[in-house]
A protein has these predicted regions:
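Interdomain linker/hinge connecting the two RecA-like lobes of the SF2 helicase core
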Residues: 2-3, 113, 119-120, 149-156, ...
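Conserved P-loop NTPase motor "coupling/switch" region that bridges the ATPase
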Residues: 21-23, 41, 65, 107, ...
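SF2 helicase/translocase ATPase core recognition
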Residues: 112, 134-166, 171, 205-234, ...
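Conserved helix-turn-beta segment of the N-terminal RecA-like "Helicase ATP-binding" lobe
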Residues: 31-54, 159-162
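SF2 helicase catalytic motif II
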Residues: 90-139
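Conserved helicase ATPase core of P-loop NTP-dependent helicases/translocases
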Residues: 57, 289-293, 301, 307-345, ...
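Walker A/P-loop
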Residues: 1-14
Length: 371
């Protein structure tokens, strides 16, 4: 589903109706407390967040019928469910020795499953191994395809559905051809919908809501000279690759070019802070709440200095701090502003207290912004 249409509630309902316990929920760290609350709210179930205190004993809570829902984040999968990772030249599923206790789970819910889109990372392989043989596997995401159709391969494999699409080789040849690695899209969409994919769109579901309106505000950045100098430096650097072959250009894009573009992006963001702050003042002085997204940590910090009463959600906050910030923004009438960065605050948080969101800068990937 698109963001905001209740994927969490649907997953809880599915697990509850199917009596698919014990259930493991894998989600971003910032969302663990929210999942725990939602299970209590909608299913009346007490869910346990896995941590160092229950690392060795969590299964006892199920065996004694005290708890049958367990929640962990992607980064902790190795700690709780992997005994050993062999240092093989080629990392495969055979390189991983899993804790036998993973066989206890009847269902696995994978929130923000696009985080498992890579076929090569340990994180994706851990999720795949944990899900193997499970009766129910639910993948939740608003953006199943972040870059191109290859993003679907590992997600389908985790669900045990890749063979329904002809296997890895056929999928790549049929649906990942061409310069954009996307082909036969209509056929792929039909086959997904016919097998394992359920998607709702806001335009079709939330028909009684007013249309979303977008406003673009053009500003003169306060550090124009610094920006022009950095831009000229980038242009001069790119000219050296005017006649370069594709391999050389690709290598450059992975290195110094991206660094220089990042510098340009940072200068631009800093230069917008003064005017952007005036916009924020206009909104909150008018009695409205506002959600602000930024990409760079230093931009969040500068805005926090200007608006010390604001709450923030960043990578430096732990799960409890993030949830506390969200709760205050949602429930405290005097808290008018929340500032988030895309990675930590862009997924899974409930921020319905405001109908206005502003972006001082965009992330590298548009889907992060849309999410």
């Amino acid at each position: 589903d698109q963001p905001g249409l209740g994927k969490t509630l649907q997953a809880i309902g599915t697990v509850t109706i199917a009596k698919a316990y014990p259930c493991l929920v894998i989600c971003p760290a910032a969302l663990k407390i929210n999942w725990q609350r939602e299970f209590k709210k909608f299913a009346g179930k007490n869910a346990m967040i896995l941590d160092d205190r229950n690392k060795a004993s969590w299964h006892r809570f199920f065996e004694t019928k005290c708890c049958n829902i367990f929640i962990t984040n992607y980064e902790s999968l190795k700690k709780f469910f992997v005994l050993k990772v062999k240092e093989d030249a080629r990392f495969t599923m055979k390189s991983i020795e899993f804790d036998p206790r993973i066989s206890l789970f009847k269902s696995v819910v994978i929130d923000e499953s696009h985080k498992c889109k890579s076929t090569k990372t340990q994180q994706s392989k851990f999720v795949e191994g944990i899900c193997k043989g499970k009766e129910y596997i639910l993948e939740l995401t608003g953006t199943p395809v972040v870059n191109n159709n290859t993003d679907l391969i590992q997600q389908l494999k985790i669900m045990g559905r890749l063979e329904d699409f002809g296997g890895y080789k056929y999928f790549v040849e049929r649906f990942c051809d061409g310069p954009k690695q996307s082909s036969n899209v209509k056929e792929l969409n039909w086959r997904l919908s016919s097998t394992c994919f359920f998607r709702r769109e806001k335009a079709k579901v939330l028909t009684q809501l007013p249309d979303k309106s977008r406003q673009y505000i053009e500003v003169d950045i306060s550090n124009r000279k610094e920006y022009d100098k950095a831009e000229a430096d980038l242009i001069q650097y790119l000219r050296t690759y005017k006649n370069a072959d594709d391999e050389k250009v690709a290598k450059a894009l992975r290195g110094e070019v991206m660094v220089k573009m990042g510098i340009l992006k940072a200068i631009s963001a800093r230069g917008k802070i003064k005017v952007f702050s005036e916009f924020i003042h206009d909104v909150i002085d008018g009695g409205e709440k506002l959600i602000v997204f930024a990409y760079l940590k230093e931009v969040v910090q500068e805005l926090k200095k200007i608006f010390p009463e604001a709450v923030t959600v960043t990578g430096e906050d732990n799960a409890t701090q993030k949830q506390t910030a969200v709760d205050r923004f949602q429930n405290d009438p005097s808290c008018k502003l929340i500032i988030l960065n895309y990675k930590s605050g862009g997924t899974g948080l409930t921020l319905t207290a405001s109908s206005r969101v502003a972006f001082i800068e965009f992330p590298w990937t548009f889907s992060d912004c849309e999410q």
